[in-house]
């Protein structure tokens, strides 16, 4: 029996795939547990429509990420932070991705999850630092952060 998978089933198929499976397995497990539905003309049309909508949403997400990357590439886009430091320019404490994300939201009204910032170590010194931000699977941008004496 041909079925359209509604979700990933380990060892059998991924969501949206159309595969031939044994009749008993399809009726007694896949269809009963709503993991698949029979591959009829109506169901195939619905799957194609869903796939098209998902592709469109993914393309819009990628375009939005590229637009944000261009905004970050602008030299005027700098996240300003302040901190106390010693005489040698080293901070007392550090600037973390959480603080950078909060300052970015406060200054530019752009909300980015702190886990998307790929900062290997917190910032311990005054001055400018480029922080890589993974906006999408295919898009990584550099965000300029300026830490000054506060």
UniProtKB/Swiss-Prot annotation:
By its UniProt entry, which InterPro entries does this protein fall under?
Ribosomal_bL9, Ribosomal_bL9/RNase_H1_N, Ribosomal_bL9_bac/chp, Ribosomal_bL9_C, Ribosomal_bL9_C_sf, Ribosomal_bL9_N, Ribosomal_bL9_N_sf
As for family, the record states: Belongs to the bacterial ribosomal protein bL9 family.
Asked if Ribosomal protein is a keyword of the record, the answer is yes
Organism field: Leuconostoc mesenteroides subsp. mesenteroides (strain ATCC 8293 / DSM 20343 / BCRC 11652 / CCM 1803 / JCM 6124 / NCDO 523 / NBRC 100496 / NCIMB 8023 / NCTC 12954 / NRRL B-1118 / 37Y)
One GO MF term: structural constituent of ribosome
A GO term from the CC aspect: ribosome
Recite the UniProt keywords alphabetically. Ribonucleoprotein, Ribosomal protein, RNA-binding, rRNA-binding
Instruction: Please give the biological process terms from Gene Ontology that the record holds.
Output: translation
Q: What is this protein called?
A: Large ribosomal subunit protein bL9
**Role:** Binds to the 23S rRNA.
Enumerate the PANTHER family for this protein. 50S RIBOSOMAL PROTEIN L9
**Span of the signal peptide:** none
